[in-house]
């Protein structure tokens, strides 16, 4: 693998020149006192150093070694304990955490960049702090003050970790049929019993305690999803003075043997009357858990982005160094036996596809993160409502589109290496294996597409969609003639997406299958148009940029490539959606 270098220049461009995030922070009382442009850039610079120096060098060896289970205990690969200690002591686990309990208090748009850096360094490693931060979000939003005071400081400090225990052997997407039970006790606690599977970070040796958030049902709970409650179940009970007490019967029965993320412990967790404490109200557990889902799903999208970035950095270095054949137009490196493969059109196509999708994804994920910040911190109810609705609309796109493209980019990066990309020592095949899970967990991408199409577009009668569409139209209307090469094709594709949205809304009235039939390709069409909007914004900023000519001309060249070679994918997606659901049901089940 090439030495990982955090893409700080591009992050600064997106945050400062494209979105001017400091202006947003100044208008949000919860952030104005905490962060400004200089502070944010200092945070990102330091995060870049920590991830590149302490985490990235572990990735290849950790993939080979993996995690090991023995008698209920899980050991992580060599170097992980020390790297996690360094990461935690720097405050990075709590980078977006509540300052009242020891968090750094950075806005989501900054913690999103940190997430990209840590996941590009090692996706397996990044899962441990990600799950802890997610658990903290739910605890902070829904738990009692006593639970918050008892657990959050050590979790933000990285001394304790967190996990989310949702899935059961028979219950994945349909959590309403879970069987884990919680029995009330006289002292106000609960005894939690059941088995959970696919639990990331359910057991490991990185922290002295692990705080599990467990979905379970009370004895008198209503059937289905409306009968689910959320419980905090610590690995070790915590005494009144904050010291660790007895071991709770929340144990790891085994770890999964899987395709990728070998250094992340994916556990089967057994709860045998484990002591737990309710988080939020009885039978409102899904609402409490879903507080963090928008953050977590954006985080998974960023994992796809991060894997693509790491693969791209490796592929660019290899393409510059690898000598094979001569350029079609004649020798470029006349003093060498062959030209670097970066001169060949197809290699350039793959590299530019990666670059355009990565940089578009970085801008889009930052945009969504800014909406999360507005929804959380704005005191203007209208602003907060608009941001909440945009978050609802865009989160499934961020999760699914970034991870689908993350796999595409990782495969391109592997392909640039040719046969060497298939060999483990180069690291490219690891990135393909690792990023694959991002399309599956935190809600499969098919489920994300159904969420976008059914719950967000159709259920709102297109109102959520029009919020975003209208914003893009306002940008197009205000763009000067110098942006015509981007604004005009953006407008044309937006017209297509508007028409497609209306078509699906109409078709769904008569045939519910049309939603499912359209959903994945609709999400992709939406994603390409959203990226076109991001690229038009970036082109405007690049045209206004001063100094650093190579960066800005490179940005404009990549924008032109996106509009010329990638945005036209919308055409085939629209045609496919409008073919309807009929052909999906021409075969009986036995004919497959």
Model-inferred region functions:
Residues 2-5, 184, 261, 367, ...:
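Alpha-helix capping/hinge segments and adjacent helical runs
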Residues 113, 459, 475-592:
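C-terminal amphipathic alpha-helical interaction region
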Residues 189, 193-247:
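A short core secondary-structure module
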Residues 32, 64-76, 288-299, 313-354, ...:
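Glycine-rich cofactor-pocket loops
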